[in-house]
Amino acid sequence: MRQFLSSDRINSEIPQEKSEMVGFSDIDNSSRQIKEMEAAFRSAVKTGQIPGAVIMARDHSGRLNYTRCFGARTVVRDECNRLPPMQVDTPCRLASATKLLTTIMALQCVERGLVRLDETVDRLLPDLSAMKVLEGFDAAGEPKMRERKGKITLKHLLTHTSGLSYVFLHPLLREYMAKGHLQTAEKFGIQSRLAPPAVNDPGAEWIYGANLDWTGKLVERATGLDLEQYLQENICAPLNITDMTFKLQQRPDLLARRADQTHRNKADGRLRYDDSVYFRSDGDECFGGQGVFSGPESYMKVVHSLLQRDGRLLRPETVDLMFQPALDAQTEKQMNQHMDASPHINYGGPMPMVLRRSFGLGGMIALEDLDGQKWRRKGCLTFGGGPNIVWVMLLSALRFVFFFFFFFFFCSS
């Protein structure tokens, strides 16, 4: 039987943090800032604000190599009555941090001539091409659908400008489901993610949605491979990664030590184990937008390969393309207005709201510098995942990857 720990019980049983730190003496003012950051994380674990975290940083030269693990990977004690520590190889549900991996897989297909960025998806995703746009509902409550204006391209999918949205984020789709036009998924199923209709035309606006789940299907159809097989052969094998997978339930060695999902109870502020189906099962197919489990160190290998432009995953010129703003002026303005009006969502990670932002192939891009506590530099690419996973990458400076596992942005109770 699982035994549960409240936040005040965590304090006396916190696993010792582990660290590796090389090269910070070469960075002005970093020593004090790093100590302050580490103290903040130690305090957050001790007071039960978070169960555990992993923080990593690398630079392109290899001189900077920083890793620090804090706390535990769960609030549930093991059979020895201990809290198992959070480690760099702890398998973690990446959620939307999966989107970077699927973007890389799609761009590999582009490099190999299997698809073009500006090619319509008609050939590989005819089911998406046939999808109509939901405009609203008539007096009888029936959905009003219209034909899509324009064609969806791979670039639209990679930049969230295809006209698709997640059900939980869009009022029309929430009403569409409430009226019985979508079935509530009883399990973690791909069709429930791909079934909702579009809510706008391609290129009309930035909308966060199931674009990378569809991109994963595009990669499968372009290559003839299951996305898990493609991931293993084209991302994991080149980087010697052995703990990254869509199929955690088929890997008992990883399943036994994965990070648990937790949420914060609003009534008492304590962390609770969350027995979410999303965290204890695999999808019926591979979700390109949210389906991967990985250890932090393995995810770091991926982003560090991009940072080094080493050609093992993508050509240097393709990596450079990822860092170029991909939205036109009107869509960029609309995206910024939407995000400013929805600070509680904070898509993909903590991009400060005061920054002007765009979107590239794989993440959000800062269009200006910001100093101080919310430091960012123009051109940095960032995204993450719902369980408080954040990665930030600069081609010419530090690149951080954060792994926090304590509660979903939308899931406190």
UniProtKB/Swiss-Prot annotation:
Q: Which residues are catalytic?
A: 96
Its transmembrane ranges are none
Q: Which Pfam families match?
A: Beta-lactamase
User: GO terms for molecular function, please?
Assistant: acyltransferase activity; hydrolase activity
Pathway of action? Polyketide biosynthesis; lovastatin biosynthesis
Q: What keywords are assigned to this protein?
A: Acyltransferase, Hydrolase, Transferase
Its induction, per UniProt? Expression is controlled by the monacolin K cluster transcription regulator mokH.
Q: Tell me the residue numbers annotated for binding 2-methylbutanoate.
A: 386
UniProt binding sites for monacolin J: 93, 193, 208, 278
The source's superkingdom equals Eukaryota
Q: Which reaction does it catalyse?
A: monacolin J carboxylate + (S)-2-methylbutanoyl-[2-methylbutanoate polyketide synthase] = lovastatin carboxylate + holo-[2-methylbutanoate polyketide synthase]
Q: How is it used?
A: Monacoline K acts as an inhibitor of HMG-CoA reductase involved in cholesterogenesis. Its hypocholesterolemic activity might be useful for lowering cholesterol levels in the blood and reduce artherosclerosis and coronary heart disease.
InterPro entries per record: Beta-lactam-related, Beta-lactam/transpept-like, Diverse_Enzym_Activities
Q: What is its EC number?
A: 2.3.1.238
Free-text function comment from the UniProt entry: Acyltransferase; part of the gene cluster that mediates the biosynthesis of monakolin K, also known as lovastatin, and which acts as a potent competitive inhibitor of HMG-CoA reductase. Monakolin K biosynthesis is performed in two stages. The first stage is catalyzed by the nonaketide synthase mokA, which belongs to type I polyketide synthases and catalyzes the iterative nine-step formation of the polyketide.
Family statement: Belongs to the class-A beta-lactamase family.
Which PANTHER family does the entry mention? (LOVD), PUTATIVE (AFU_ORTHOLOGUE AFUA_5G00920)-RELATED, BETA-LACTAMASE-RELATED
Protein name per UniProt:
Acyltransferase mokF
